[in-house]
Regions:
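Acidic, glycine/proline-rich low-complexity segments that act as flexible tails and inter-domain linkers
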Residues: 5-100, 119
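Glycine-rich anion-binding loops and their surrounding alpha/beta cores
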Residues: 17-21, 27-28, 76-81, 101, ...
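A glycine-rich phosphate/pyrophosphate-binding beta-strand-loop-alpha-helix module
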Residues: 54, 102-148
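Acidic, glycine-rich active-site loops and adjacent beta-strand->loop/helix elements
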Residues: 93-98, 123-129, 155-157, 223-224
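Gly/Ser/Thr-rich beta-alpha loop segments that engage phosphate groups in nucleotides
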Residues: 95-98, 125, 134, 183, ...
Length: 224
């Protein structure tokens, strides 16, 4: 399914129809979702349309297929480079747990890398959590703005959603965008471990990872 979209050309989308479907709690198809995210990435929606879209998904809840389509589009627009390792793992969290814990995913990634595993850690600064991966690395004295072969700092790789930040901040609630970071690693990890802020999203993200073609994955949520 994903490979079919490599040379896919977007059509003009009926945004009002999509908003009506979401208002009636109907899921969008993979194609509709892919087209919609491309419209968002190309800044083709008005702030009112974007705000309505985010709010509609907040009430409906995204499907695994919708998330996989969104992530596929973002990966297609991200900066890339060739990688030789046939197996690689990403360990990442969604953030947003409000527990103010240390950055578990990054410390785990460093531990696994020291054991010889090929880790492709994709991360950002903390937005809804106290310490994102980039915050931790910066405090360790690591330059996060190195070339992407050395550091997969999300803002240096994904430029498609910079204009969305203002609307997200004005709305002030978690949205499907909080779930896209862990799914949008441009190196397409073969194995993945994702921590989520709510147990309600474990199966949802697992389904999205399956659609995206990840070979083995675990989506976890702590009970503490």
């Amino acid at each position: 399914m994903i490979l079919n979209f490599i040379h896919y050309k977007r059509r003009s989308i009926p945004i009002k129809l999509y908003l009506q479907k979401l208002a009636h709690l109907e899921n969008l198809s993979f194609v509709e979702s892919y087209d919609l995210m491309e419209c968002i990435a190309e800044n083709d929606l008005t702030p009112a349309q974007l705000g309505s879209l985010i709010t509609s998904f907040y009430h409906k809840g995204p499907s695994g297929e919708e998330l996989a389509a969104f992530a596929s589009l973002l990966i297609s627009k991200a900066k890339h480079f060739e990688i030789q390792d046939s197996k690689r793992i990403d360990i990442v969290g969604t953030g947003g747990s409000a527990r103010k814990t240390f950055n578990v995913s990054t410390t785990t990634a460093l531990l696994l890398a020291s054991m010889g595993l090929k880790v492709a850690k994709h991360g950002n600064r903390g937005i809804t959590s106290k310490s994102g991966s980039a915050d931790l690395l910066t405090n360790l004295g690591i330059n996060i703005n190195m070339d992407m072969q050395t550091c997969l700092f999300a803002p240096n790789i994904h430029n498609a959603l910079k204009h969305v930040q203002g609307v997200r901040k004005e709305l002030g609630f978690k949205s499907f965008f909080n779930l896209l970071g862990p799914l949008s690693n441009p190196l397409r990890p073969t194995h993945q471990l994702i921590g989520v802020f709510s147990k309600d999203y474990t199966e949802l993200l697992a389904n999205a990872l399956k659609i995206l073609g990840v070979e083995r994955a675990m989506v976890v949520h702590g009970l503490d």
